[in-house]
């Protein structure tokens, strides 16, 4: 496979597969007892209206909309996701607390740089290399431009991949207004920390509308400048997008998005136990930083061919660059690691509704071609002289083909969806002046989702899904004829129920996941060697409850919510068999209340996580360098009051305090800048939004 070529390969195969999907089968009469969704694109990341209903979705799924995000007082994507059952924000990386990365773990899976979930932005993979480097050490998006967060923890492995063991997370940017005229918003948020001396300002702007010619456009901007709660933790970013939509006619629509993102964060890193006790907010690594930028274009086309069929195609291309600089323990040498990536993807999808007797089949088939090209470079710089070493370089190339098909069968109150996803992956990693490491893998991922609509309010569901994680670029170096690496495989089973009526929303899910064949580094071997030797077992219960009091009652305007998750993730291989997986909490919960009265809104909420281990050996005692040891649990309280300004429509001013009790808590970082990482102290913020 040529490393530097970027033109799509095997696209005739994609076209052939797409044409083969066009059905010629005549539809039969529909049983009137079966109530169905219409086939129409609704903007959901799931692509077609057939699967858009969270209420009827046959798997654990949570959607957080913009109103709830704003009421939570969240300043980042990680903050906003703490209310989602089964999701843990670990912040155990060297960039924790900055805007450059995202650290999300689902159901006890590792959260460092979110490597186990398929993370999407408007349906497009967010990772700089979805197959070769799925880690979000560089996460090019920001909270203020997001309309909703959709987290599918189970039941989505057929449609989306490749890293779907930890479910699917989609961030949807703000939609283009469909009404005539201009609509917009301008906002600013000022944040100050009670300790550490830091403050920051976030800005956001939105302007858009749709003309009489059915052409819609929107401009989205979000930015930040300032410093976090650690000394020398300067943090700034710019997030810009320009979106277009054009309705060709009643059946056809074109969509496009141009995007740009840049970020630069100074990263103080971890502290030893003695350093933390002296001053937890100090910075002993003032030269460390991470930075990155990304430009991209997304194109989409949808054709609702008839009341029973729909065709959609999504194409995207993006270029990303990220770099880091970390000083060594002796404080004499900087290691600089610049990396460049290019990703091209195209995905056609076709849906056909067929009526066979009393059953109705919504058959969806799709194909995705994804091409990655990039390089990893590394060199050192002497701090005293500035002299740089020779640069080590690896060039990476991946061509991946995925074909999927599922059939959503509706018969009576049953919704049964069998499906399968096939992946074919070609990967090369070439060392400059050295050897080339290659991997050729294919995998079939069968799944079945079942939902029963017991009443109009209650859905009972269950599913069995097969998920996988491909071999990553850095792991190819250790592959030999006697040590071939294969994709990681996980098998997940869910049972759950979801209730939704005008006042009450509730859900509970029981899950069990067996994650075998994990690629792990073999201890005690130099140079680093990876093998398929890892296995973990994950099980738990996720629950959520939300209640809105009646508008004509004494408690009108009051909303209460709570969620609780119990997870047990155990290692099943090696010397630590039977011990907990590092960096997850067995118990997490959140509770809160929202009360609206006469233009005022009051919010109070709390999040809790139990203690966790920072190493596979489950070491309780803390080492002097604070790299290992038990991480204590914590409960935090937040409060916010917002006032809707009279005469200015939906505009408002809000004041809030996060970590009301000023709890001093920390996590651990096990990277090259390891140690205790103090979390945010009591935090004050004021924000204003003007909407028109």
Label for each model-derived stretch:
Residues 124-153, 242:
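Short acidic/polar hinge/loop motifs at secondary-structure boundaries
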Residues 247-259, 291-432, 437, 545:
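Face-selective signature of the C-terminal outer-membrane beta-barrel domain
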Residues 558, 610-617, 642-692:
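C-terminal beta-signal and adjacent terminal beta-strands/loops
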Residues 196-225, 229-268, 289-304, 357, ...:
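Transmembrane beta-barrel wall of Gram-negative outer-membrane proteins
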Residues 186, 204-205, 300-304, 310-326, ...:
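Membrane-embedded beta-barrel scaffold of Gram-negative outer-membrane proteins
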Residues 78, 82-125:
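Extracytoplasmic beta-strand/coil segments of soluble accessory domains associated
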Residues 350, 357, 413-416, 512-514, ...:
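Gram-negative outer-membrane beta-barrel transporters
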Residues 264-266, 270-279, 371-384, 426-431, ...:
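Surface-exposed extracellular loop regions of Gram-negative outer-membrane beta-barrel proteins
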